[in-house]
Amino acid sequence: MSFLEHFLDKEQQKPEVLAVRQAAKTRIFEVQEVDLRFANGAERTYERLTPSRKPAVMVLPVENGELIMVREYAVGPERYELTCVKGLIDAGETPEQAARRELQEEIGLAAATLTPLRALYSSPSHMFGLMHVFIAEDLRASKLEGDEPEPLVPVRVPLAQLDALVGDEALGNSQTLAALMLLQRKRPELFQAA
């Protein structure tokens, strides 16, 4: 039994899905309206964003006591953000294959060692958004052509300064923050050497 299961009520009945309708569709996203009836009789319509239910990967490349991140334009907040290597899993790819491909496309590196940290949902109340997080080590140069509109800028952050990075208000990507905290928690030996 997981730690979280102690806090969840196994007897609690999930809401009944009464209807699902497409409210809008773009090239990348679909907005659905989902009519729900809860066990107490209350009915609500929720909206959810469905990016074709494609899962994604996020990769944390570590080399010589540094984490290699990327500076990339984020259209949501309309600014450049420091984030991790990431991208969608293509049809027929495993999460590991996608992580290896994204690493080569975005920062021109291949990893001899790729370790899964865990999978996270970015916003489960409103979308599928499953993200598989990996640590990449034993890196070497290996470039693949990607689909980015402009070159991503690799940024090396000393692991010894990760606490300062996580505490910096300018780092606003929740998935990146979660991945960095997972890295600290699951691989503490990387920080002892830093």
Identify the residue ranges that each predicted region occupies.
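A short coil-to-beta-strand element that immediately follows conserved catalytic motifs
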Residues: 110-117
